[in-house]
Amino acid sequence: MKLPLVLTISLALASLGACSPTLDWRETAAEGSGVVALFPCRPDRHARTLELVGSKLKMEMLVCPAGGATYALSFVDVPEPARVNPVLAELRMAALGNVQAEMPSSSPARIAGMTPNAEALRVAAAGHLPDGAAVQVRAVFFAKGLRVYQGSVIGTKAAAETDEIFLSGFRFPA
């Protein structure tokens, strides 16, 4: 699996925003995502082909740095229902593995309108970047139909209130 580039992009963008004094909250509806997200900054859009559960799939990401953290929403369309659970699990494992996460905590994801799924989880963990710097990661993994989503915040310190606003700010328009 080649997710380190996702982490590299996120961390590079975070370093650009380290001097940003304020958060500028905005609703963002990424074209083709089917979801509206509440970002504390104006996200850039990126796309990458990844190998997930044995298939090459296009993952699209909205990413922005703010307040010493990187905020990201990623989404990928899965070709068949039987692959939704494995893709959710693989994305979660990769996100935690990319920062060598230690002792993650998890709870069921609760996004109004999502497809109920046992692999839809919120996670929080402490980890380390390749250079040894300590980071906190908080993320939510969920699906609607055949589209799988990952919302994540990665930063050098946890900002519980800001992280919560972002991670609970996803919604599916009517």
PLM region descriptions:
Residues 32-49, 167:
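Proline-anchored loop/turn motifs at beta-strand termini and strand-loop-strand connectors
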Residues 15-18:
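C-terminal motif of bacterial Sec signal peptides marking the signal peptidase cleavage site
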Residues 44-84:
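Secretory pathway targeting signatures of secreted, lumenal, and periplasmic proteins
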Residues 25-36, 154-157:
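Short aromatic-glycine motifs in intrinsically disordered, low-complexity regions
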Residues 1-11:
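Bacterial N-terminal signal peptides that target proteins for export
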Residues 43-45, 87-102, 145-174:
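Surface-exposed amphipathic alpha-helical segments
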Residues 20-22:
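Bacterial signal peptide processing site
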Residues 42-61, 95-143:
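Signature of long, low-cysteine stretches enriched in small and polar/charged residues
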